[in-house]
Each structure stands twice: as structure tokens, then as C-alpha cells.
A protein has these predicted regions:
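Residues located in well-ordered beta-strands
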Residues: 3, 15, 20, 32, ...
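Short Gly/Pro-enriched turn/cap motifs at secondary-structure boundaries
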Residues: 20-21, 54-59, 124-129, 135-136, ...
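Glycine-rich beta-strand-centered segment in the early N-terminal region that forms part
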Residues: 22-36, 49-97, 102, 143, ...
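Local beta-strand N-terminus motif with an aromatic residue
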Residues: 79, 179, 224, 246-247, ...
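Mid-domain Rossmann-like dinucleotide-binding core that forms the NAD(H)/NADP(H) cofactor-binding site
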Residues: 81-82, 135, 142-144, 148-232, ...
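Glycine-rich cofactor phosphate-binding loops and adjacent beta1-alpha1 units
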Residues: 174-177, 213, 217-298
């Protein structure tokens, strides 16, 4: 039996309880978690903005050590340090055939499986495939990537979602070039990773935007050259910082209609806006036909940073080893499983960066 944070039903409080994990079957791996990041996607799953079968063990941003492998698993062995890959690609759908593995239609199919049971015998599903809010997990081997050398094991959890997403938004989706100007809306875990990625890309001006003035120090440490407290005048303030032109690129990491609109308005004519934040269906963004034509701007969605974890993890590890990417700087609190509800509340209040559950 291992301890886990169980979501019994959508909208219900998490329950910290013991669960019964089976031994890994063919093609499966058992992992002892070192850490798991608390992501806004976990909050979205708990409140029903996103849907997975319940009851479920949430948590998708994790790192740990292999305890056992099932039959047929050849690329991993007990004792290996690993990062969990919550969105493994199938390799055969249309998106995968185009090389767009981040859009794989079957990536989350494992979330419907029963992977464990409560002490009372209730079936449990692995939220977003990997069920990282637990001391241990059993996952498909495709959900496990070897951790490159030189990356701290606990902090490596952030590579599984926040960093892949933020780095990919800058380098794969928006394709920021050296010397360009960038605005990042939202300075939570993904936003802070995006700021670091913009700095790595060589952006000349990096503006962080957040509702919380107390995040300025965090944002500047991550690479922001300027900080703007979000308001109705945000776009005007950003244009003032960029010679009245607006930024080349805006990355929205919040998922609200108002911030998507502000991000669009903050870009120059011909600028690019990338939306990373997950918003609800009730968040309606309005544009008129003339402005779409006249401004010549581009608006694009960005799923998981348009990243291929197997391809990008070694690149990110090299940035960590070279000191260009500081994983620890993204973490504003290290908590136990019992601290997850408070971490969710802090997200809703716009407080802090990434909370990291450590085991």
C-alpha cells in the first residue's frame, strides 16, 4: 500500500489515503516518486474544466526512480532515475504521422484504465496517465523517460510539464528569435519557465505581466527585464516599453479571455500571440474582422509547448547543466501530499510559482 491524493469525484476535495498498486505487467514500469509538481491542469481536472474518469489519482508532472519493470521493458532497469511523460504519442495517428506528437489523439487514452484500487477495493484511474500524486505509481513504459545525467532528481519533475510547455511555447510555437521582444502573461510555474526560455532565446526585452505585484522579483530572476501589474492598461504599458510598437511575441499562460485579448493587443503589427493557458468554454474572446486583417497578427494555440518529450528532454537537460535553465528558481514551495489543496488555492489567488510535492 502507498499513500496517494485521490480525487473521488469532480469538484470533491482530494482525499489522502492508501491505495493498492499491482506489480507491473508486460510493458509496464513501477516508479517511486521523488517529486511531483502541482500544475494548473491538475486544478482544471479537479474542478471539471478538463475531464478524466474518476475516481482518479491526479498529478502528471513527476520524477523518480524505477523500482521494477514488467516483461518486455528493455530501455529501463530498477534504479534508473526517470521523468514521467504524461502524454505518450501512439506513433500511428494522423498527427503523429505528421510529426506533431503533441497533438496525438490517443495520448491520454491510458487515463481511462484502472491502474490501482483503494483499500476498500474501489477502482482508481490514473489522471493524465501517470498518477504522480502518490508515493509510487505503475505506468506504461512509454510514459517513462530516462533522466539525463546532471539534473537534480526532485527538480527534474518540472521538466515533465512546466518547462517543456514554457520552453516549447517560445522555441517551437512562437519561434522567438534573438533580439525580438516578448511579453509573458502569467508568472506562475509555466510563465516563469517561459520567461527563462525567452532569455535563453536571446530576447532583447522580456516583459512579465501578472496580477500579483509580489511576483516581480520572481519574474525578474527568471529573466524579465520589465514587470507590469495586469490592468485595463496593460497593452498600453507594454507598447510604451517598446517604442509604442508592441512586442514581437506575446505568450499567454493564464487561460482567460481578458488576458488573451490583452496579449493580442500588446503585440506589434504582424506580431505573434501564443496561447498556452487552458481556459474554459465560457471564456469567449472577441475580435472584429477589420482588426484581424489590418493588424496582420497571428494567434495560435499551443498544446504542451508543441513539444516531443523524447526529443526535447536532452536539450533541456543540457540547458540545466550549462546553467542557462534554473529549475529550482521555478519552485516557490515544497510540500507534502496534504499541501496540494492549499497549492490549488494559491493558484486561484494568483500566488507563487510552482509548488512541488516531495516524497
Amino acid at each position: 500500500m502507498v499513500r496517494a491524493a485521490v480525487l473521488p469525484a469532480v469538484g470533491a476535495p482530494l482525499e489522502i489515503t492508501e491505495i493498492d498498486l499491482p506489480d507491473p505487467g508486460p510493458g509496464q514500469v513501477r516508479v517511486r516518486l521523488a517529486a511531483a509538481g502541482v500544475c494548473h491542469s491538475d486544478l482544471s481536472l479537479s474542478n471539471g474544466t478538463m475531464r478524466v474518469p474518476v475516481p482518479a489519482v491526479l498529478g502528471h508532472e513527476g520524477s523518480g526512480t524505477v523500482l521494477a519493470v514488467g516483461e518486455g521493458v528493455a530501455h529501463l532497469a530498477p534504479g534508473d532515475d526517470v521523468v514521467l511523460n504524461w502524454a505518450p504519442s501512439c506513433g500511428s495517428c494522423h498527427a503523429c504521422s505528421l510529426g506533431e506528437v503533441w497533438l496525438c489523439v490517443d495520448a491520454l487514452s491510458g487515463s481511462a484504465d484502472v491502474y490501482a484500487r483503494t483499500a476498500a477495493g474501489v477502482d482508481l484511474h490514473p489522471g493524465l496517465n501517470v498518477a504522480a500524486f502518490a508515493e509510487e505509481t505503475v505506468v506504461a513504459a512509454s510514459c517513462v523517460l530516462p533522466l539525463p545525467d546532471g539534473v537534480p532528481l526532485a527538480d527534474a519533475a518540472l521538466l515533465g510539464c512546466a518547462v517543456l510547455t514554457g520552453y516549447g511555447a517560445v522555441h517551437h510555437s512562437a519561434r522567438v528569435r534573438a533580439g525580438e521582444t516578448v511579453a509573458v502573461f502569467g508568472a506562475g510555474g509555466v510563465g516563469l519557465a517561459t520567461l527563462q526560455a525567452a532569455r535563453i532565446a536571446g530576447a532583447s526585452t522580456v516583459v512579465a505581466v501578472d496580477v500579483s505585484p509580489e511576483k516581480e522579483d520572481l519574474a525578474r530572476a527568471a529573466g524579465a527585464t520589465d514587470f507590469v501589474v495586469a490592468s485595463a492598461d496593460t497593452a498600453r504599458e507594454i507598447r510604451a516599453l517598446t517604442g509604442k510598437q508592441g512586442v514581437d511575441v506575446a505568450v499567454e499562460c493564464v487561460g482567460r479571455a481578458s488576458t488573451i485579448r490583452a496579449a493580442w493587443d500588446s503585440t506589434r503589427r504582424g506580431g505573434r500571440t501564443t496561447v498556452v493557458g487552458i481556459g474554459g468554454k465560457d471564456q469567449q474572446v472577441t475580435f472584429n474582422a477589420l482588426e484581424i486583417f489590418h493588424w496582420g497578427r497571428t494567434l495560435s494555440g499551443c498544446v504542451y509547448g508543441n513539444s516531443d518529450p523524447a526529443r526535447d528532454l536532452p536539450v533541456l537537460a543540457e540547458h540545466v547543466r550549462a546553467g542557462r535553465l534554473d529549475l529550482g528558481a521555478l519552485v516557490t514551495e515544497r510540500i507534502a501530499l496534504e499541501g496540494i489543496p492549499a497549492a490549488f488555492a494559491n493558484m486561484l489567488a494568483g500566488k507563487g510559482g510552482r509548488a512541488l510535492v516531495t516524497f
